[in-house]
């Protein structure tokens, strides 16, 4: 980014009374990984599992082939743990300074929260929420990774579901509404 563009951005942020950041695959790319929809990663996954990620990462596959789903989930989404990038840390600093009011993100790795942001809307959920479909108990990534086969709830023994929106799932309407409210309040959107 040129010095002129940086100066314009700085002025826009300083003059803003309500700033919202919209984050997605760009932040993920900055962390050194590609999303499942990137052409190179999708091809590598299809070569490895014999099925495209567009089918592997669906509610139908999770329900019909939970063992295979969790092999894919643990290998492709939980290993290695993706670390927050400079963007996530910079957004947290802006929030602490009072120049950023909200982060709306489509990534599922809690990058903004783990970078230090407090007011974050995770549109597609997060891999850090793995809940029992029966009692609702939340399970850590470490627990999911430690399970040899299909992870079952430590409390009641029922199946665990990742707290993410799979391909084809509807995004929670309450999160959409909350995001719209935040964007309406904003006089500056950072993309």
Predicted regions span which residues?
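Conserved catalytic core of sirtuin-type NAD+-dependent deacylases
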Residues: 1-191
């Amino acid at each position: 980014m040129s010095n002129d563009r940086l100066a314009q951005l700085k002025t826009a942020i300083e003059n803003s009374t309500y700033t919202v950041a919209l984050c997605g695959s760009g932040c993920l790319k900055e962390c050194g990984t590609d999303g499942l929809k990137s052409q190179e990663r999708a091809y590598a996954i299809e070569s490895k599992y014999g099925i495209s990620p567009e089918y592997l990462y669906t509610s139908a596959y999770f329900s019909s082939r939970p063992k295979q789903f969790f092999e894919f989930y643990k290998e492709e989404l939980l290993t290695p743990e993706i670390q927050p990038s400079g963007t996530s840390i910079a957004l947290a600093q802006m929030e602490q300074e009072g120049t950023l009011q909200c982060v709306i993100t489509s990534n599922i790795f809690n990058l903004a929260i783990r970078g230090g942001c407090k007011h974050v809307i995770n549109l597609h959920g997060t891999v850090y929420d793995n809940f029992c479909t029966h009692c609702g108990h939340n399970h850590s990534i470490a627990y999911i990774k430690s399970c040899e086969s299909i992870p079952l709830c430590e409390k009641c023994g029922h199946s665990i579901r990742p707290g993410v929106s799979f391909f084809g799932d509807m995004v929670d309407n309450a999160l959409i509404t909350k995001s719209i409210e935040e964007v309406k309040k904003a006089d500056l959107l950072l993309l």
